[in-house]
Amino acid sequence: MGVAFDKCETRPANIDAILNGLDRYNPETTTVFQDYVVQQCEDRTFDCYANLALLKLYQFNPHLLQPETVTNILAKALTVFPSPAFSLCLALLPAHTQPFPATNDEAQAASQTSDFVESVQKLARLSTLLESAQYAQFWSTLNSDDLYADLVADVAGFEELVRIRIAVEVGKTFREITADVLEQWLDLRSREALEKFVVEVCSWELDKSAPAGTVVKVPTNKENEARSEVKSERVGIEQFGRVLRRGFEQAA
């Protein structure tokens, strides 16, 4: 069985004690969770369970909500795609922050807190692009507006973490991919930077003799291995006999 997506090996003991006790519902613990979010941003870790607990506290105590902390949680969730972390966090936010307000009241509330709502919706846009594997468009969108840069500024190594996640998804799908395409998907502006990332970070190989130009070769793994699969089912004679009898039975 795989490791749960919300499991965090680096979770401090005091945070674990709060999460496993009644204090997780105590509004006074919001400051502890908020400091923990700052720590996650600095040391490149992500604790989904703790972050969801903080967002739940915000849901019960709206006056305690800190927009910057929320956007940092969402930005961190982007670095662990394609896990459900981002959508789970988004679901705990006020209804008027959602990309598509359902009622006029929600739309009016959105206009009253437009900066926070705009930030949430921009991050939701980035999540959609990542989840739909539109990697080149993700980078172009991220680089298109200074607000995006501000939203991810507190997350140390944001771009590097996202590149690694994209590379993981590429490794599940491809055995070979042209360097030109991968360069766009990883937003690496030079061939030298791409080659360094591919070899040192991914441990993949480069074939510069291919007719189509430089090709990146991904080692075989259980996800990208092409294999035929034959499925069969065995039907016992008793089961088959019951089917035949039922076909001759007259309706009562």
Curated annotation (Swiss-Prot):
Where mainly found?
A: cytoplasm
GO BP terms:
formation of cytoplasmic translation initiation complex; regulation of translational initiation
Where in the numbering of this chain does the PCI domain appear? 46-225
- Cytoplasm among keywords: yes
Q: Quote the Pfam families the UniProt record gives.
A: CSN8_PSD8_EIF3K
One of the record's GO cellular component terms: eukaryotic 43S preinitiation complex
Q: Keyword set for this entry?
A: Cytoplasm, Initiation factor, Protein biosynthesis
Which compartments is it annotated to reside in?
Answer: Cytoplasm
Q: Name one GO molecular function term.
A: ribosome binding
Transmembrane residue ranges: none
Which InterPro entries does this UniProt record tie to the protein?
ARM-type_fold, CSN8_PSD8_EIF3K, eIF3k, PCI_dom, Transl_init_fac_sub12_N_euk, WH-like_DNA-bd_sf, WH_DNA-bd_sf
This molecule's function is given as: Component of the eukaryotic translation initiation factor 3 (eIF-3) complex, which is involved in protein synthesis of a specialized repertoire of mRNAs and, together with other initiation factors, stimulates binding of mRNA and methionyl-tRNAi to the 40S ribosome. The eIF-3 complex specifically targets and initiates translation of a subset of mRNAs involved in cell proliferation.
Quaternary structure annotation from Swiss-Prot or TrEMBL: Component of the eukaryotic translation initiation factor 3 (eIF-3) complex.
Q: Which family would the database say this protein is a member of?
A: Belongs to the eIF-3 subunit K family.
- Put simply, this protein is called Eukaryotic translation initiation factor 3 subunit K
Origin organism is: Aspergillus terreus (strain NIH 2624 / FGSC A1156)
